[in-house]
């Protein structure tokens, strides 16, 4: 009986050591492979910002081609809100191409289409005389929201977003149900997210602060070379 117990303890001890070694190996691998970490479903602020920063050159290039170079941080803030930089459709722009959600499988296409859609909303918004918050909100609610705000003073508010959402829900109540969850914060305004513009602005501020720190670190590094 004692021999059996010793055998069980030995097996358990070996298993614990094996698990510890494997776990340690994975931790070391992750520590030295930042690209691998960014692909994992880990959403710490630092990792999310690293994902977004990877898209910065492409975002800058696409915005420059549209004459909107000043909006890099905003687009990255929108990406932060849409997907945290994860997946093949980081700008969640599939639907603006007439596709189903997440049907875009090329992240670069997602970014290009997302910026194309933002540019369209931006130009439409400027023509209609609405504020930037309305343009941001329209990325979530569509161009119809720009028309709606233009008819109600030209300045976005969450109350106007709720009113517009309510209108759209009445047109198709079986579709916009918040997943049937009455406890969803959007309920009963289940078309879009009436808080979208505010969330994007908060995340844009976070992105701007991160980019400023990165710029200062780069400058200091060059100064010490």
Curated annotation (Swiss-Prot):
Main location: membrane
Biological-process GO terms, alphabetical: carbohydrate catabolic process
Keyword match Transmembrane helix: yes
Any one Pfam family match given in the protein's UniProt record, by short name: Lysozyme_like
Gene3D superfamilies documented for this protein: 1.10.530.10
Keywords attached to this entry: Cell membrane, Membrane, Transmembrane, Transmembrane helix
Segments traversing the membrane: 12-32
Entry protein name: Uncharacterized membrane protein YocA
Cellular component terms (Gene Ontology): plasma membrane
Subcellular location(s) of the protein: Cell membrane
Membrane topology recorded in Swiss-Prot or TrEMBL: Single-pass membrane protein
CDD domains cross-referenced by the UniProt entry: CwlT-like
This protein's record includes keyword Cell membrane: yes
Disulfide-linked positions: none
InterPro entries, sorted: CwlT-like_lysozyme (IPR047194), Lysozyme-like_dom_sf (IPR023346)
Domain of life: Bacteria
